[in-house]
Structures are given as structure tokens and as C-alpha cells.
Amino acid sequence: MDVRRRSEEPVYPSKVFAADEKPLKPHKKQQQQQEDKNTLLIDASDALPLPLYLTTNGLFFTMFFSVMYFLLSRWREKIRNSTPLHVVTLSELGAIVSLIASVIYLLGFFGIGFVQTFVSRGNNDSWDENDEEFLLKEDSRCGPATTLGCAVPAPPARQIAPMAPPQPSMSMVEKPAPLITSASSGEDEEIIKSVVQGKIPSYSLESKLGDCKRAASIRKEVMQRITGKSLEGLPLEGFNYESILGQCCEMPIGYVQIPVGIAGPLLLNGKEFSVPMATTEGCLVASTNRGCKAIYASGGATCILLRDGMTRAPCVRFGTAKRAAELKFFVEDPIKFESLANVFNQSSRFARLQRIQCAIAGKNLYMRLCCSTGDAMGMNMVSKGVQNVLDYLQNEYPDMDVIGISGNFCSDKKPAAVNWIEGRGKSVVCEAIITEEVVKKVLKTEVAALVELNMLKNLTGSAMAGALGGFNAHASNIVSAVFIATGQDPAQNIESSHCITMMEAVNDGKDLHISVTMPSIEVGTVGGGTQLASQSACLNLLGVKGANREAPGSNARLLATVVAGSVLAGELSLMSAISSGQLVNSHMKYNRSTKDVTKASS
């Protein structure tokens, strides 16, 4: 069978036949296509085939600026001398010619082809449905001839696979390009550029946009562009940014994920608690859980609240120490205290002034006011009350100079003897008796070994180190984990972790009596981070979510006892691990990363 075939000819989408137009003859068509091809292959950069050597560039740059300076100088002289501008000398004429030549060269150097692409884009880059239909018709003519009676197969479906642009390799020392996220589109892109350029302050995005999540997304992209560092691993979705506005965090760009584990059940005062612990330290939750198991098997622990009062200590100054002492006697007078309490209590329906403790340093007086704060941690509440008292005392002592509403005699977020001795927040003691059988089977150690280790480590060792409130094994580990999980202030872990752990053999040396005394646990169940969804869920797990309307302050006090009970469990387990020599092995198993941490940041 004589089947004629013809080779496929290149087709250019810029040539499409109209409905009433006849196809060109073969030789004319080939000629037309060759002309179209030549037209398409013309590069805009060929318009100015000027050499671009370094010496030539330097010559034309120098000529351009020199001639411009000369012509501007002559122009100023003509204006000053009232000489017509069209009257030019031979040197000025040469300067004008040199200027034109340098401008032409510089246009070619900086890419005249870039400008021409906008002119020729409509002809060379256009692609519509007519072009595609024309190509399909041309391809369909490459099959068997229909006049020979051959069945014409359906043209195969043309699938155009998108070609991914080649990814440039980036050296470890190169600065990566800022990531372009979904926030970088449309109006958001303009806002991002304005923030990067300093036209819009980053802190004002929430108020300007009215959308906290959108503001966080834009701020995150801005940080990536400014620093050149990727924030891909910092999550943005799945968080209510309106809930932290004006309360928890300013200028957010995302949130950090911390795993939460459960230790328990902790049998405390006859009730069982499942304790949430947010931590990245392996073995911590497992160790605390073992301590809870030992306490549960021995009948549970007992916790007693000793004191409950938040403090704030302003600093005031007088002209003489005598005047400072007079104010000290005034505020410590029981009769005057009633008046001060009435003024203080006006700040809140939960705030109740309990006592005032004063200290003098020369002519400076520090007044440590202590008050109950209900279910709130109470720093804002007590500060408002202190301000009311200062305003009242200012009328009684006009020469009193208020240095600051906080004089560090409080003492907040710092290890201080005044907190260790007088207490701050909730002062709690928690105890349990662990039977000999549990010590051996669950804790894998001996009672005598635990008592000796506690004396030499937690008591003598801490004294040798000059510890202040640190007569324990790792109370801050448990306090921090529970604080983060329940929305407390992590910085107040400093004084809240003040703890002395005591161990003693009882019942003829067979059983172990263990106790922890913590004088300054600062917690609350309302306000701050407690209203966030995750932290609120953890508080709900403990049964202390929100304020207790029937007995104000009872939820916060119960949370403090749970913290102390958890510390008791953690102390018991860690001391047992050290006593039996299990500490290193357990940490090598549960607290050692296997990932490669040598990779450079991107």
C-alpha cells in the first residue's frame, strides 16, 4: 500500500487562519513560516551590538557624568549672564554629542531588550484557543489518507506536563531568599512591603487590619524577608490570636508547640488528680508518674495550705530618716491599718489587705503590702490597691517622694530571703508516708539510702552551695512543667520553686516519711494565660478552671496543693533513681536525641 507521509513542519502560534481564509500553498507556506520564524528569533539585545568591556564601560560612565557636569555649569552661567540657551559654542556642541552617545551606550548596557519585551510580548508570547486548535488540526493531517479507505484513528490526547523550573543549589553559607507564603498576595503584599520599608509599624497591624490572624501572618512574612531566615517550622494556623490581644502577647508571628504529658493519678487529700505537664525534657513525666504511683500505693499524700497572700512593696523617700520612720510607725499602727485597709480594698471585690511589713534603708522606706486575691494570681490586683494607698499617704505626708510602686522588697521573679521566710502567694506543705514494700518494689531502693542521700545532697550539699530556697532535688522541673501547661507565669517559677525536701525513717526505720515545704507558690485560675484554650483545658482536667463563685480563691488554692503534691512525687522518684544508680541509664534511654543537630540554619 502506497501511503504518502509528510514530515511535520514547525508551527508557530502567531499565524492562525481566519474562517474564510484559504491555506497557503506548500512553497508559499514554507516561505511564510520561515519568515515568521526569523521574525520570532530576533532578539531585542541585537539592536545595539555594542562591546561591553570593562574599559568601555568606565569610559562611557566617565564621559556621561563629566559632560553632564559641564553642560549644567554652562547652563547656570547662561542664566546668570542672560545669554540665550540656543547659542552654543563648539565645545558645548561636542559635549551634547558626547552626552547623546553615552546615553545610547548606557541604554544598551542596561538592557534595551528588557524594554522591548513589553512591546513584542503581545506578538511572541500570546497563546489562545485558536492557536491550540490550529496545532491540533495540523497534527491530525499527519495520519493515514482517508481516500485509501483507511480508518482514521482518533488523535491521541495531548497532555502538556508542567515543567518545574530548575532549583538553584544553595551553598551553606549563602543567605536564602525570603519565603513567599500565601500572605504575599494582593493587598497583603503591599502591606508587607510597607512594613519592611518602615512605612507601617509592625505593632500597629492588628489595629489597622482588624484581623489578628492576618496581622500575625503578615508579620511572620516580614520577619522572613528582613532576616532571610525561614520560619516554616513555626505554626500559624490553629490558634485564636484574638484571645491574646492586649492580654498575653504583643506582635505575634505564631505559637510554639510544647508536648503535654500526664502524670498520675496523684492521690492527694483523698482525691485523685491527673497532672498535666508541658515539657521537652524526656524522662520527667515518667519519673513524676512513678512517684505518683508510689504515693498512691502507700495511701496517698496530705497537703496543707499555710498562708495565702500576694505582695507588692513600693519604695518611698523622705528628706530625713526620721520622717521615714514616722511613716513606718503610722502604717504599722493597728488603728491606722483599718483606714489603709479600707482604701486598699476599694480596688477590687476580691482584694483584702492582710498586713504591712516595713523596712528602712536610711531615709528610704519599703512597705510590703500583702493581700488575698481570690482565684487570680493577683499582681495587677495588688498593684491597684497599692496605688490607692500611696495616693492616700501622699495627702498625709506631702513631703513623701514615691520612687516606684515596686521596690524589689516584694520580691517578684527573683530568689529572695523575704519570700523564703515570709512567703508569697500560697505557702504549702505536703507530706506522705511511703511503705517499705513500695520503696523496694516501685522505687527500687532502700529507706536508709534515701534518708542519707537527702541529708547529704538536698540539705548539706545545698548549704555548701549557698542555696536560697533550693534545698531540693528538682522542684523547679515539676513547677515549670505544670505552670506552662496551666497558663501560669513561667518567670514566677523562680520563687514558686523554693522548696525544702525532708526525708525521715519512721515506724522503726521501715517506712519513709517525705515532705516538701514550699512557701511561695504563685498561681491563679483566672486571668493571664489561663484563658487560652489549651491551658484552660488543662485546668479543667484538674477541676480548677475559672473562678469558684461559692468559695472565691478555693480553685487557686487547690491548684497550689496539686503543684506541691506533684513536686513531692517528682522528688521521691528522682531521689530514688539517684540512690539506686538508675539516673544515667534512664536519661540515656528517654532523654537523648538521635537526630542530626549539625545542620546549619536556613
Swiss-Prot record:
<feature type="glycosylation site" description="N-linked (GlcNAc...) asparagine">
    <location>
        <position position="458"/>
    </location>
</feature>
<keyword id="KW-1133">Transmembrane helix</keyword>
<comment type="similarity">
    <text>Belongs to the HMG-CoA reductase family.</text>
</comment>
<protein>
    <recommendedName>
        <fullName>3-hydroxy-3-methylglutaryl-coenzyme A reductase 2</fullName>
        <ecNumber>1.1.1.34</ecNumber>
    </recommendedName>
</protein>
<keyword id="KW-0325">Glycoprotein</keyword>
<dbReference type="InterPro" id="IPR009023">
    <property type="entry name" value="HMG_CoA_Rdtase_NAD(P)-bd_sf"/>
</dbReference>
<feature type="glycosylation site" description="N-linked (GlcNAc...) asparagine">
    <location>
        <position position="345"/>
    </location>
</feature>
<dbReference type="GO" id="GO:0015936">
    <property type="term" value="P:coenzyme A metabolic process"/>
</dbReference>
<feature type="glycosylation site" description="N-linked (GlcNAc...) asparagine">
    <location>
        <position position="124"/>
    </location>
</feature>
<feature type="region of interest" description="Catalytic">
    <location>
        <begin position="188"/>
        <end position="602"/>
    </location>
</feature>
<feature type="active site" description="Proton donor">
    <location>
        <position position="587"/>
    </location>
</feature>
<feature type="active site" description="Charge relay system">
    <location>
        <position position="281"/>
    </location>
</feature>
<dbReference type="InterPro" id="IPR023076">
    <property type="entry name" value="HMG_CoA_Rdtase_CS"/>
</dbReference>
<feature type="transmembrane region" description="Helical">
    <location>
        <begin position="44"/>
        <end position="67"/>
    </location>
</feature>
<dbReference type="GO" id="GO:0008299">
    <property type="term" value="P:isoprenoid biosynthetic process"/>
</dbReference>
<dbReference type="InterPro" id="IPR023282">
    <property type="entry name" value="HMG_CoA_Rdtase_N"/>
</dbReference>
<dbReference type="InterPro" id="IPR009029">
    <property type="entry name" value="HMG_CoA_Rdtase_sub-bd_dom_sf"/>
</dbReference>
<dbReference type="InterPro" id="IPR002202">
    <property type="entry name" value="HMG_CoA_Rdtase"/>
</dbReference>
<comment type="pathway">
    <text>Metabolic intermediate biosynthesis; (R)-mevalonate biosynthesis; (R)-mevalonate from acetyl-CoA: step 3/3.</text>
</comment>
<dbReference type="Pfam" id="PF00368">
    <property type="entry name" value="HMG-CoA_red"/>
</dbReference>
<feature type="region of interest" description="Linker">
    <location>
        <begin position="116"/>
        <end position="187"/>
    </location>
</feature>
<dbReference type="InterPro" id="IPR004554">
    <property type="entry name" value="HMG_CoA_Rdtase_eu_arc"/>
</dbReference>
<dbReference type="GO" id="GO:0016126">
    <property type="term" value="P:sterol biosynthetic process"/>
</dbReference>
<keyword id="KW-0812">Transmembrane</keyword>
<keyword id="KW-0560">Oxidoreductase</keyword>
<feature type="active site" description="Charge relay system">
    <location>
        <position position="413"/>
    </location>
</feature>
<feature type="transmembrane region" description="Helical">
    <location>
        <begin position="95"/>
        <end position="115"/>
    </location>
</feature>
<comment type="function">
    <text>Catalyzes the synthesis of mevalonate. The specific precursor of all isoprenoid compounds present in plants.</text>
</comment>
<keyword id="KW-0414">Isoprene biosynthesis</keyword>
<dbReference type="InterPro" id="IPR023074">
    <property type="entry name" value="HMG_CoA_Rdtase_cat_sf"/>
</dbReference>
<feature type="active site" description="Charge relay system">
    <location>
        <position position="489"/>
    </location>
</feature>
<keyword id="KW-0521">NADP</keyword>
<dbReference type="GO" id="GO:0005778">
    <property type="term" value="C:peroxisomal membrane"/>
</dbReference>
<dbReference type="GO" id="GO:0005789">
    <property type="term" value="C:endoplasmic reticulum membrane"/>
</dbReference>
<dbReference type="GO" id="GO:0004420">
    <property type="term" value="F:hydroxymethylglutaryl-CoA reductase (NADPH) activity"/>
</dbReference>
<keyword id="KW-0472">Membrane</keyword>
<keyword id="KW-0256">Endoplasmic reticulum</keyword>
<feature type="glycosylation site" description="N-linked (GlcNAc...) asparagine">
    <location>
        <position position="591"/>
    </location>
</feature>
